[in-house]
Curated annotation (Swiss-Prot):
Record-given protein name: Hemoglobin subunit beta-2
Name of the coding gene: HBB2
Note, other: Sphenodon Hbs have properties not found in other reptiles: poor cooperativity, high affinity for oxygen, small Bohr and haldane effects, appreciable phosphate effects (those properties are also found in the Hbs of primitive urodele and caecilian amphibians).
InterPro entries named among the record's database cross-references: Globin (IPR000971), Globin-like_sf (IPR009050), Globin/Proto (IPR012292), Hemoglobin_b (IPR002337), Hemoglobin_oxygen_transport (IPR050056)
One GO CC annotation: hemoglobin complex
Native organism: Sphenodon punctatus
Signal peptide positions on this chain: none
Length: 146
């Protein structure tokens, strides 16, 4: 994947402003609410019976933070995302058996959360760079499925 200097700058500069705790918990919560079939991968998280329960669930928040923190690795390794996610791809494919389409859904949720948090700073050019990044990450996570 080729990244222009502008794309790299847009991604990295926005990432420095991201509150990983807040955005991560919100992103995973939204995924579980908007796409309820994804909840089956998180049955050990306890109460996921309503949007209120999901948004208040400390395990959802903690795992969301973990997911967003992992996403930060992509930001740091834009030129080597496939290798960065090799072990996570293997885990999600061979052990967790996650439908790889869910990675695209989570990527879409990431975009929504970033847009909600950054408003006018999340310009169309910034969105395009981030959209590219979430697609590259989703593809890297799905790599072991092929």
């Amino acid at each position: 994947v080729h990244w222009t200097a502008e794309e790299k700058q847009l991604v990295t500069s926005l990432w420095t402003k991201v509150n990983v705790d807040e955005c991560g918990g919100e992103a995973l919560g939204r995924l579980l609410i908007v796409y309820p079939w994804t909840q089956r991968f998180f049955s050990s998280f306890g109460n996921l019976s309503s949007s209120t329960a999901i948004c208040g669930n400390p395990r959802v928040k903690a795992h969301g933070k973990k997911v967003f923190t992992s996403f930060g690795e992509a930001v740091k390794n834009l030129d080597n995302i496939k290798a960065t996610y090799a072990k996570l791809s293997e885990l999600h494919c061979e052990k967790l058996h996650v439908d790889p389409q869910n990675f695209n859904l989570l990527g879409d949720i990431f975009i929504i959360v970033l847009a909600a948090h950054f408003g006018k700073d999340f310009t169309p050019a910034c969105q395009a760079a981030w959209q590219k990044l979430v697609r590259v990450v989703a593809h890297a996570l799905a790599y072991h499925y092929h």
